[in-house]
């Protein structure tokens, strides 16, 4: 590649941006900018490996290794910018403890539950797995096997895994770690609109007059999108930024209005805003009358705990998602109790501030963008909160037009594209279909060439239930891919670790590194990372992006896709299907599950010649695997509002936002003129619902399952920091990021620290009924909790803070609440 003046300017711009951000570029990147080595580096595009923003990066490879990355200036998402994690993407694959071969617990030369991890071949690994799976299937049937996947799976990996589980093993016991982050958003979308994923797009950032962050610290969790809000705010003086949270963080630095509310009281605030809109005649009646219906949610629905838990037994309508049609007058009556006085009393937010927030929503001339992520979704009433925010936008008609957008942000690179769109949840199928719907199962069975009745109608075990079933010995063979749930999930000591170490169970973990989850497993499989394989992700604005494999894997690591497909070869159809199904499909007798799933004339229809020379998976299987899987998967959504472009197109663009119809992407869904599925003359068409109308759903404030008391007198909130991503599996192996933030700390109000005779930097014990951890106290810095609350990030494997979290979930979405549980803090003597 010749070093043109344009390339030189771009390269130096990257260096300048890094310097401004306080970043020292890796030596390889510095050489790229300063020396003739530039000519030896090959560049290609790929979406970033981290969050759900979907930034595109340019990846520089040399001698079979990634040596540099930089922001992609052609990308509409990030326009050449990266966050600090993105600047160091080149180092995530090269940690010193990268796993390079399968490791099986062995003793005296054979597998043993309490044995030491011993290197084995892939054949030994898969033979051992298959032996365990076959024994479990024969003894207990399909519900005894399960899989826990990821919003970091590529589209093809998630699709292959879901197909293997639901069509091959006939088990719906597959769930992604997106259950912990996006499940409440999914259910909220489905209840209100009958279809999943945001109606808006990132272009809304340049059009909104007011931004409202509901429990989201975008400055650290979505920093590139935060730059777009910052630019809009600083270049347009009329724009206002509102930040609601249970503690102060970096997003407050830009906020015109900051609101610190009591945990769980966001429900009361949202209902107050709806009441304010009604009482101040700010309802957009033309929109409401034409495009909405009013419904009432069942209340007192419990907390997703075990059935014998006293809180669950006390609930009047445990786990009920029933909606009852009501009139506007009934809806008005339901929100009337949420006066500003009542909302202020519950939330702790001053009345004047609440009114200021409500006015911005009520003003017909103010375009409002509401944004949220884990603060709203990781909530025992997360689905309700999603719907209460939609209510506000629907009452005012501020939806699906530029700058008017209720926008759920995602935390993982393909939580949308893989977990949600592919349907790797225990209850879902691709394109918003569900296993409980006979018509949906019939569609899937037709596309997958399955006999009727193959896919079980009952949803499988969701993430938290998988832990309980492992613990109880109901789920016995379990495969974890592309996540670190032993560190990320709740209530580790009581529910998760006992299930992993249950002698009846066989646990397999596929990961590039020896995580806490891997170390609790029986078999560890080394996994290819990011651009060591070809794949596709789908980001928060419905943008699907693809990339080519650009380097070989480290050691004998294999992609999750390769592992799923290769494992499926170990099973004859007679070993996984009953005779009644084989009688309906005699062509599968004597065939392997691999033959049925992947050599079906669809997945294997694209010849190897169409793939690039560097495509390990395709060369192993003898056909263009990624294209075949993608095109079969895309069949589900085309013509049904989830249209994807042909696979090859995605390699020529920086992503496209579905539905893609006649070669054109969709920016705003449901809006006539923008969405090809919106009927002519409709204005708005919420076509996910049969009547084309969105639901305004009434739901009240309800208290959390646990609150502080005299013994456990502080709230604990867990979350992330800018420099690390989730459990730190990748970022803690990047020296620059590790040095920047080497340890998790307990952010605490100075007065709470003083009351416990604790000084900044001293070690304390945080404890509750579920366990305890040791951590240093921080009373200054970026996160400043109010009195009565502490914040501890969960990236640090030495401080497994999430073991203190109760495994309470939203009863509708089954998503865990990581944002509030009572603890006590004592100084270490």
Swiss-Prot record:
It catalyses: 2 Fe(II)-[cytochrome] + nitrate + 2 H(+) = 2 Fe(III)-[cytochrome] + nitrite + H2O. It is an enzyme of class 1 (oxidoreductase). Binds 1 [4Fe-4S] cluster. Binds 1 molybdenum-bis(molybdopterin guanine dinucleotide) (Mo-bis-MGD) cofactor per subunit. Its cofactor is [4Fe-4S] cluster; Mo-bis(molybdopterin guanine dinucleotide). PROSITE patterns: 4FE4S_MOW_BIS_MGD, MOLYBDOPTERIN_PROK_1, TAT. GO terms for molecular function: 4 iron, 4 sulfur cluster binding; electron transfer activity; iron ion binding; molybdenum ion binding; molybdopterin cofactor binding; nitrate reductase (cytochrome) activity. Mo-bis(molybdopterin guanine dinucleotide) binds at residues 85, 152, 177, 181, 214-221, 245-249, 264-266, 374, 378, 484, 510-511, 533, 560, 718-727, 802, 819. One of its GO terms (cellular component) is periplasmic space. InterPro entries: Asp_de-COase-like_dom_sf, CT_Nitrate-R-NapA-like, MoPterin_dinucl-bd_dom, Mopterin_OxRdtase, Mopterin_OxRdtase_4Fe-4S_dom, MopterinOxRdtase_cofactor_BS, Periplasm_NO3_reductase_lsu, Prok_molybdopt-oxidoreductase. GO terms for biological process: cellular respiration; Mo-molybdopterin cofactor biosynthetic process; nitrate assimilation. Residues 1-30 form the signal peptide. Residues 41-97 form the 4Fe-4S Mo/W bis-MGD-type domain. [4Fe-4S] cluster binds at residues 48, 51, 55, 83. It is found in: Periplasm. Predicted to be exported by the Tat system. The position of the signal peptide cleavage has not been experimentally proven. Its EC number is 1.9.6.1. Substrate binds at residue 794. Keywords: 4Fe-4S, Electron transport, Iron, Iron-sulfur, Metal-binding, Molybdenum, Nitrate assimilation, Oxidoreductase, Periplasm, Signal, Transport. Transmembrane segments: none annotated. HAMAP family: Nitrate_reduct_NapA. Belongs to the prokaryotic molybdopterin-containing oxidoreductase family. NasA/NapA/NarB subfamily. Catalytic subunit of the periplasmic nitrate reductase complex NapAB. Receives electrons from NapB and catalyzes the reduction of nitrate to nitrite. Component of the periplasmic nitrate reductase NapAB complex composed of NapA and NapB. PANTHER family: PERIPLASMIC NITRATE REDUCTASE, RESPIRATORY NITRATE REDUCTASE. This is Periplasmic nitrate reductase. The gene is napA.
């Amino acid at each position: 590649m010749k070093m043109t003046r344009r390339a030189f300017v771009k390269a130096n711009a990257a260096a300048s941006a890094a310097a401004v951000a306080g970043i020292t570029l890796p030596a390889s990147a510095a050489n790229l900018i300063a020396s003739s080595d530039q000519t030896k580096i090959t560049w290609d595009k790929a979406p970033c490996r981290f969050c759900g923003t979907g930034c595109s990066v340019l990846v520089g490879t040399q001698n079979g290794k990634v040596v540099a990355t930089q922001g992609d200036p052609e990308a509409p998402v990030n326009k050449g910018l990266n966050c600090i994690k993105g600047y160091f993407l080149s180092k995530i694959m090269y940690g010193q403890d990268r796993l390079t071969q399968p490791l099986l617990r062995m003793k005296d030369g054979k597998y043993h539950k309490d044995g030491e991890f011993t290197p084995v071949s892939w054949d030994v690994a898969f033979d051992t797995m298959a032996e365990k799976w076959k024994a479990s299937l024969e003894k207990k049937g399909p519900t005894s096997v399960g899989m826990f996947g990821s919003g970091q799976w590529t589209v093809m990996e998630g699709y292959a895994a879901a197909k293997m589980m639901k069509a091959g093993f006939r088990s719906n016991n597959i769930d992604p770690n997106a259950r912990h982050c996006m499940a409440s958003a999914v259910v909220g979308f489905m209840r209100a609109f009958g279809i999943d994923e945001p109606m808006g797009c990132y272009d809304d950032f340049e059009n909104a007059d007011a931004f409202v962050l509901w429990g989201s610290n975008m400055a650290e969790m979505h920093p590139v999108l935060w730059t777009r809000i910052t630019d809009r705010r600083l270049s347009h003086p009329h724009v206002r930024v509102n930040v609601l949270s249970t503690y102060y963080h970096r997003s407050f630095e830009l906020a015109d209005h900051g609101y610190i509310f009591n945990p769980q009281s966001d429900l009361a605030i949202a209902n107050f805003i709806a009441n304010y809109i009604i009482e101040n005649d700010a309802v957009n009646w033309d929109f409401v009358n034409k495009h909405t219906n009013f419904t009432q949610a069942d209340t007192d629905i419990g907390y997703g705990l075990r059935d014998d838990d006293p809180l669950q037994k006390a609930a009047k309508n445990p786990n009920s998602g029933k909606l009852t049609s009501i009139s506007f007058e009934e809806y008005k009556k339901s929100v009337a109790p949420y006066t500003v006085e009542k909302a202020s009393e519950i939330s702790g937010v001053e009345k004047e501030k609440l009114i200021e927030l409500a006015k911005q929503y009520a003003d017909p001339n103010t375009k409002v963008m509401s944004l949220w992520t884990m603060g709203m979704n990781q909530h025992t009433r997360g689905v309700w909160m999603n719907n209460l925010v939609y209510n506000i936008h629907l009452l005012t008609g501020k939806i699906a037009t530029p700058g008017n957008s209720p926008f759920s942000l995602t935390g993982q690179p393909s939580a949308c594209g893989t977990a949600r769109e592919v349907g790797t949840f225990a209850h879902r199928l691709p394109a918003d279909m569900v296993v409980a719907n006979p018509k949906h199962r019939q569609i899937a069975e037709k596309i997958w060439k399955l006999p009727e009745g193959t896919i079980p109608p009952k949803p499988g075990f969701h993430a938290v239930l998988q832990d309980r079933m492992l613990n109880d010995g109901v789920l016995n063979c379990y495969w974890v891919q592309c996540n670190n749930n032993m560190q990320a999930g709740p209530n580790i000591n009581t529910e998760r670790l006992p299930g992993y170490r249950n002698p009846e169970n066989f646990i397999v973990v596929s990961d590039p590194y020896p995580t806490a989850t891997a170390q609790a497993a029986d078999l560890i499989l080394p996994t290819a990372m990011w651009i060591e394989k070809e794949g596709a992700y789908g980001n928060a604005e419905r943008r699907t992006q693809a990339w080519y494999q650009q380097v070989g894997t480290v050691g004998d690591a294999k992609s999750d896709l390769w592992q799923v497909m290769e494992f499926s070869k170990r099973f004859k159809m007679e070993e996984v299907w009953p005779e009644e199904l084989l009688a309906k499909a005699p062509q599968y007798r004597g065939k392997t599950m691999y033959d049925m799933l992947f050599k079906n004339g669809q997945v294997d229809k694209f010849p190897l010649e169409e793939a690039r020379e560097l495509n390990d998976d395709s060369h192993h299987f003898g056909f263009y695997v990624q294209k075949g899987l993608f095109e079969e998967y895309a069949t589900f959504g085309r013509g049904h509002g989830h249209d994807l472009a042909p696979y090859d197109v995605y390699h020529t663009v920086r992503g496209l936002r579905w539905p893609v119809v006649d070669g054109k992407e969709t920016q705003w869904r449901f809006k006539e003129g923008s969405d090809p599925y919106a009927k002519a003359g409709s204005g708005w068409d919420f076509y996910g619902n049969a009547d084309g109308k969105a639901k305004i759903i009434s739901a009240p404030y309800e208290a959390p399952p646990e609150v502080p008391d005299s013994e456990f007198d502080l709230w604990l909130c867990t979350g992330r920091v800018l420099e690390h991503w989730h459990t730190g599996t990748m970022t803690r192996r990047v020296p620059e990021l590790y040095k920047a933030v080497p340890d998790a700390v307990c952010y605490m109000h100075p007065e709470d620290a003083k009351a416990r005779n604790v000084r900044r930097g001293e070690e304390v014990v945080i404890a509750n009924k579920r366990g305890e951890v040791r951590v240093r106290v921080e009373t200054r810095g970026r996160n400043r909790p109010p009195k009565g609350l502490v914040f501890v990030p969960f990236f640090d494997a030495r401080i497994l803070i999430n073991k203190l979290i109760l495994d309470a979930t939203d009863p509708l979405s089954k998503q865990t609440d990581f944002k509030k549980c009572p603890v006590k803090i004592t100084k270490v003597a």
